[in-house]
């Protein structure tokens, strides 16, 4: 996005909370007549809110120390420090993506420990056979999640079905989609698991932003 070069640094000072009263007034006046800077500032605000909303995601224990230990020792220069200082949001976003990816891959390793099911309704688990059965005539209200097993769906699921490292029983494979009111998604690889979690996370963030934009009391300075 093309912005006015003369006000680009002022925008970053404003977002860092270091702008003086005069600088704020100058920026507000400029935003009234410059749509590109106004849109750029709005995108930066959304990026900051996105990063702050992800504070609950943690990297695996020892991850940071391990990464730092493997980094090659290089001579520090003022050039990269200047770039990092001028683009703190890009640096923070890169660190966030690394930590989030590590957390998702770590979570995937725990999904292969044994058969597990979550859902609101009657179902039968045969751990020895690795089978989950929703009996005929029974209804699962809401989403059904099956990990490391085979799903035999004879009843109905009023929601989504997520199969993590799992599959449908071959006898019910073609009939089952007609018994699910929501979506059916299969995740059988670590990358698919990471993508699924990232997609769900981004959907939640977008929903928060949409709710904020629909709020008539929310205004930008």
Swiss-Prot record:
One of its GO terms (cellular component) is membrane. The keyword Zinc applies. Is processed by three successive proteolytic events. First, the extracellular region of RsiW is cleaved by PrsW (Site-1 cleavage) in response to cell envelope stresses. Next, it undergoes cleavage at an intramembrane site (Site-2 cleavage) mediated by RasP. This cleavage uncovers a cryptic proteolytic tag with conserved alanine residues in the transmembrane segment, that is recognized mainly by the ClpXP protease, which completely degrades the protein in the cytoplasm and leads to the induction of the sigma-W-controlled genes. This is Anti-sigma-W factor RsiW. It comes from Shouchella clausii (strain KSM-K16) (Alkalihalobacillus clausii). It is found in: Membrane. The gene is rsiW. The chain crosses the membrane at residues 88-108. Residues 1-87 are cytoplasmic. Belongs to the zinc-associated anti-sigma factor (ZAS) superfamily. Anti-sigma-W factor family.
């Amino acid at each position: 996005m093309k912005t006015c070069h003369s006000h680009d640094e002022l925008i970053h000072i404003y977002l860092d909370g270091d702008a003086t009263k005069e600088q704020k007034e100058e920026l507000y006046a400029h935003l009234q007549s410059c749509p590109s800077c106004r849109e750029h500032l709005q995108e930066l605000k959304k990026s900051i809110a996105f990063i702050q909303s992800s504070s609950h995601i943690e990297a695996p224990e020892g991850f940071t120390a391990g990464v730092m230990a493997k980094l090659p020792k290089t001579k520090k220069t003022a050039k990269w420090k200047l770039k990092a200082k001028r683009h703190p949001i890009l640096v923070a976003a890169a660190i966030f993506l690394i930590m989030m990816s590590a957390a998702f891959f770590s979570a995937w390793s725990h999904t292969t420990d044994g058969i597990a099911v979550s859902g609101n309704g009657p179902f039968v688990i045969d751990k020895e056979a690795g089978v989950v059965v929703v009996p005929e005539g029974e209804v699962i209200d809401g989403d059904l999640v099956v990990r490391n097993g085979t799903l035999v769906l004879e009843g109905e699921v009023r929601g989504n079905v997520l199969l993590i490292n799992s599959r449908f029983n071959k006898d019910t494979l073609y009939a089952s989609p007609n018994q699910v009111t929501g979506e059916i998604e299969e995740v059988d690889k670590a990358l698919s698991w990471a993508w699924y979690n990232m997609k769900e996370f981004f959907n939640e963030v977008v929903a928060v932003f949409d709710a904020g934009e629909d709020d008539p009391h929310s205004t930008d300075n």
